[in-house]
Amino acid sequence: MSDQRKVQTWVIVGAVLGATLFGCFVFGVITAAIMLPVFTQAREKAKTVSCMSNQSQIARALQMYAADNDVLPAASQWADKVKPYLRNDYLFVCPSAKQLRCGYAFYRPLSNRKVSSISNPAAVPMLFDSSKGQFNYADEGQSLDLRHLNGAVISFVDGHLKWFKESDAKALFQKRP
C-alpha cells in the first residue's frame, strides 16, 4: 500500500470518527437540554415537600400553644411563642425562600383568638409562605409568596396544609374567620 493511500485511509477514518464524536456531542447537548427542566422541577418539588414539613411542624406547635393557653398567640409574637414547642429554629426557613430568615407569616385575624370561636377551622388559613422574611411577621395575606412552582403552601387552623396555585391561594384570604 502506498503512502498516499495510507494517508487517504486515515483521513477517511478520521472524518468518520470526527463525525461520530460530533454526533455524540450533539446528542448529549440535546439530551441535557431536554432533561434540565425535568431535574429543575424535581428539585423544586423536593423543596416544596420540605417546606410542607416545616409548616406542618410549626402548625402543630401553634395548635399545642393554643391548647396550652386557650388562644392562638398574638400576631406580633407568634414565632417567639411557638419556639419552645419546636426542635430547632431552622423550621422557620423555607428552602425556596430568597433569604435565610423566617419564610412564613401568621394570619393576623387569628391573633389571640380561641380556636373554638372559629366556625370552620379547616377553611381558615393560619400560616403561609411569606415574602417578608421577618420573625413574628403577620398580615392578612398581602405578603403571600408564590415561590413553590407558582403556588404557595398554606396551613390551616385545623392543622392540615396544602399547596395552592395563585388564584386559589389569594381567594382564601378574601373571607374573614
Predicted regions and their residues:
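Membrane-embedded alpha-helical segments of small multi-pass membrane proteins
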Residues: 8-34
